[in-house]
Amino acid sequence: MEKFEGYSEKHKSRQQYFVYPLLFQEYIYAFAHDYGLNGSEPVEIVSCNNKKFSSLLVKRLIIRMYQQNFLDNSVNHPNQDRLLDYKNYFYSEFYSQILSEGFAIVVEIPFSLRELSCPKEKEIPKFQNLRSIHSIFPFLEDKFLHLDYLSHIEIPYPIHLEILVQLLQYRIQDVPSLHLLRFFLNYYSNWNSFITSMKSILFLQKENKRLVKFLYNSYVSEYEFFLLFLRKQSSCLPLASSGTFLERIHFSRKMEHFGIMYPGFSRKTLWFFMDPLMHYVRYQGKAILASKGSFFLKKKWKCYLINFWQYYFFFWTQPRRIHINQLANSCFDFMGYLSSVPKSPLLVRNQMLENSFLIDTRMKKFDTIVPATLLIGYLSKAQFCTGSGHPISKPIWTDLSDWDILDRFGRICRNLFHYHSGSSKKRTLYRLKYILRLSCARTLARKHKSTVRTFMQRLGSAFLEEFFTEEEQVFSLMFTKTTLFSFCGSHTERIWYLDIIRINDLVNPLN
């Protein structure tokens, strides 16, 4: 426990000061808008009237922030409509978004500078080579084939907004900045009395995407940082209850029994049994925890996670958000693929002199398929086909030029085909390609008031086929950095960060 407290204090001591004065620097907004910050997306603030970013409005906002009664009046008179008088609704809506986005931009700076200021001898190695998303699956095949159980985790989100502010207190020791963040969160949560905390979070996410992404990433970073520590120190933590103590004694007796029955059973093997190999993968607000061990051990880790969220982050999560499945008898959804590790029968014939033997064995194979029903549902929602997969025209695109229509359909088709080409079964991909190709032909025929047959005879089917098979490298993953964490002695943990460069809306259903 002393190690945990010391590690926690060391983690909390990395605080940043003097963040609030940066909000008054004009160049911060211009720099973030023109170039982005450390490779992130450029800031584009959109108001209710589709008015985009304006440096002049930022300058006016900074001048208003210098006025002492600007925020004071907003705090003392919360019933006023949206930070300002109800007559200036547009400016109040726009100013509130600029303030929140500017706060997120400024707070990101010290976190980015901390990564860039590491010593040369401890510099994080970077791999600038681009790799396809399909390189992930050989990695999973190499790691998951020897595991037994898989836990699907829906990462919970704090319902109370004050928890997010408390998490930032560990990193930022700037009281005015934290007060400003509280002001924004309370402003959105108290806008209407009937809005619950979860609805206020969704409303905040809709209007201030950058701020919500920063708060969510801070929460996930804090959760994973201590989760990794608990993983490394799970066998070293003190026993908290008598039941666990008796369980440890019973396990020690089993170890002695193994030592008597099997003298060659080394301590290293027993340590591997006590502390089995685990792999943790997080994506799209979900996580996968795969390990080699018993079902009872996975249930214990489930209880650990629930108690960890409850006692450290002060909110309760439902146990149903963590599903435990046997890896050999279930499939899991990972980045648009349905992956599984089935056991395939294999018949081997062995010839020894005049005798031959047939050996029936089973081998594990990492299989990835495309969820056809799900993707057809997304195409149907985007009005490319019916719910049963019958292609239809896209009337909203008939006002575009022929080249724009072909370009849009071709880009969607190439993106889907390139992203899901790692599937072991290509039949679904050809069906999606057929739907988009025929939907494009129907759209062009509708625009020219002709039939699909006449249109295809005039242009030729080879033109569409050549257009849809044009290669375009749009999806790639970058192995940007690996970090070595050292918690106890010489044990280290290698963590890979995968940055998705670009992804299509149809491929990513969360967008």
UniProtKB/Swiss-Prot annotation:
Gene Ontology terms describing biological process: mRNA processing; RNA splicing; tRNA processing
What is the name of the protein in this document?
Maturase K
* Pfam families according to UniProt: Intron_maturas2, MatK_N
Principal location: plastid
Q: What are the recorded GO MF terms, alphabetically? A: RNA binding
**What function does the entry list?**
Usually encoded in the trnK tRNA gene intron. Probably assists in splicing its own and other chloroplast group II introns.
* UniProt keyword terms in alphabetical order: Chloroplast, mRNA processing, Plastid, RNA-binding, tRNA processing
Similarity section = Belongs to the intron maturase 2 family. MatK subfamily.
The species this protein belongs to is Hordeum secalinum
Q: Name one GO cellular component term.
A: chloroplast
Report the subcellular localization. Answer: Plastid, Chloroplast
**RNA-binding listed as a keyword:** yes
